[in-house]
């Protein structure tokens, strides 16, 4: 078990974080909201300095030659190698290795040993949803381009041509009616640490402004 708070993120959002484009996340204040806990946080962090461990869609392959598990991520990037003997919970990885040869496993089922990304909460505030600014929407990882609206990051609503319009479209799809303007918790975060396999890629962020991820 991890002492940290689990947060499940889509492949697109993981890539946005690793590329330095996503540094905020908003969730409805109501703890019984159907998507807040089931599809994002397992429990809501409440203090600055709280640490989140990110779960994402993944596969596990067993390397019989090296007696290692290889964790492959839907967001792309290098696989994480985990020694079958030294891992704390080899049973969970073995189960996933047996069941995930062809299909991606949902992020909610990722064991802690497979995690490659940890975040630290740097600020928390409560505000109305529609208090979000254009800069905030950009910090949520939104992008837009001039093409028909598509319900997937990097662009959700490109016809209006703004990060805020993209975020509004994203909210409508994930949480429901934007016009209800609910209170939300706003979390600012930074990357605290990553797996050793990811460290070389993060070093390229300042040089390239983006990480050359490919999605399988």
Predicted feature descriptions by range:
Residues 1-216:
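Secondary-structure transition motif
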């Amino acid at each position: 078990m991890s002492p940290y708070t689990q947060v499940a993120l889509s492949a697109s959002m993981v890539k946005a974080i690793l590329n330095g484009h996503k540094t905020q996340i908003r969730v409805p204040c109501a703890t019984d909201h159907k998507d807040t806990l089931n599809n994002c946080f397992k429990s809501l962090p409440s203090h600055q300095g709280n640490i989140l461990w990110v779960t994402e869609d993944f596969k596990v392959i067993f390397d019989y030659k090296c007696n290692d598990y290889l964790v492959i991520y839907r967001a792309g990037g290098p696989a994480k190698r985990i020694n079958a003997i030294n891992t704390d919970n080899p049973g969970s990885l073995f189960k996933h290795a047996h069941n995930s040869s062809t299909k991606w496993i949902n992020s909610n089922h990722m064991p802690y040993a497979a995690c490659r990304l940890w975040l630290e909460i740097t600020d928390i505030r409560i505000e109305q949803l529609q208090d979000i600014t254009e800069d905030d929407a950009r910090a949520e990882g939104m992008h837009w381009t001039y093409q028909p609206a598509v319900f997937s990051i990097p662009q959700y609503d490109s016809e209006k041509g703004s990060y805020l319009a993209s975020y509004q479209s994203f909210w409508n799809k994930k949480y429901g009616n934007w016009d209800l303007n609910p209170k939300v918790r706003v979390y600012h975060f930074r990357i605290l640490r990553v797996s050793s396999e990811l460290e070389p890629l993060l070093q390229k962020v300042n040089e390239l402004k983006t990480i050359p991820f490919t999605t399988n």
